[in-house]
């Protein structure tokens, strides 16, 4: 699991006008929380935060404060302004090495399905899995081998255990009946054109 360092500044919980000024300066108000502990109000640079959000992998985020302290965390939520697309807030959860954490991890499909070789098409319906694991076992992604899937076959969350390549310990929290990926038969292009009557 790759660790990303994100520079952060502590802040006092402020009024709406204070938050507006913070955002105008290119910063995003955020909160770092952990069950049973006081939350920490902070801010991070929006440009740096975007690089964390727009990634295809999961990461542990080390929040590095101006006093030199670092807090390992995962980002649990973020909000956008629907009009400007700017990031308006982010929530981080503090990680403890001996405590399990629930995270969403991207699914990486590998292999060329048998059904595709026969002319079928792959349709993925689930792109992330929600799992529970220790921080040391948190994967950047979960690799699923789909090479044995034939035309007309579907794979559900409950059937993934034999397909996952990562040798780590985690519990899948996503509904076991949720469809993940299917190999569909090719669509009929069009009905045959009617034959014109002879003159």
Curated annotation (Swiss-Prot):
CDD domains cross-referenced by the UniProt entry: Ribosomal_L25_TL5_CTC (cd00495)
Record InterPro entries: Rbsml_bL25/Gln-tRNA_synth_N, Ribosomal_bL25/Gln-tRNA_synth, Ribosomal_bL25_b-dom, Ribosomal_bL25_C, Ribosomal_bL25_long, Ribosomal_L25_dom, Ribosomal_uL5_bac-type
Upper taxonomic lineage: Bacteria, Pseudomonadati, Chlorobiota, Chlorobiia, Chlorobiales
Protein's recorded name: Large ribosomal subunit protein bL25
Subunit structure, as described in the record: Part of the 50S ribosomal subunit; part of the 5S rRNA/L5/L18/L25 subcomplex. Contacts the 5S rRNA. Binds to the 5S rRNA independently of L5 and L18.
Organism of derivation: Chloroherpeton thalassium (strain ATCC 35110 / GB-78)
GO cellular component: cytosolic large ribosomal subunit
Gene that this polypeptide is encoded by: rplY
SUPFAM superfamilies to which the protein is assigned, alphabetical: Ribosomal protein L25-like
Keyword rRNA processing part of the UniProt annotation: no
UniProt entry keywords in alphabetical sequence: Ribonucleoprotein, Ribosomal protein, RNA-binding, rRNA-binding
One of the record's GO molecular function terms: 5S rRNA binding
Protein's GO biological process: translation
Pfam families, alphabetized: Ribosomal_L25p, Ribosomal_TL5_C
Role this protein plays: This is one of the proteins that binds to the 5S RNA in the ribosome where it forms part of the central protuberance.
């Amino acid at each position: 699991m790759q660790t990303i360092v994100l520079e952060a500044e502590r802040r006092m919980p402020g009024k709406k006008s204070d938050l507006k000024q913070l955002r105008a300066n290119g910063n995003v108000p955020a909160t770092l929380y952990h069950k049973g502990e006081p939350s920490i109000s902070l801010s991070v640079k929006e440009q740096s935060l975007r690089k964390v959000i727009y990634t295809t992998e999961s990461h542990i985020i080390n929040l590095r404060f101006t006093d030199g302290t670092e807090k390992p965390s995962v980002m649990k939520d973020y909000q956008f302004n629907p009009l400007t697309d700017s990031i308006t807030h982010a929530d981080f959860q503090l990680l403890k090495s001996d405590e399990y954490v629930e995270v969403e991890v991207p699914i990486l499909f590998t292999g060329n399905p048998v059904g595709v070789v026969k002319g079928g098409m792959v349709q993925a319906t689930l792109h992330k899995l929600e799992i529970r694991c220790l921080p040391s076992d948190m994967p950047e992604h979960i690799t699923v081998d789909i090479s044995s899937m034939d035309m007309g076959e579907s794979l559900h969350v409950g059937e993934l255990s034999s397909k996952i390549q990562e040798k780590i310990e985690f519990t899948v929290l996503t509904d076991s009946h949720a469809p993940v990926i299917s190999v569909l038969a090719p669509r009929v292009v069009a009905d045959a054109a009617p034959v014109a009557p002879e003159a």
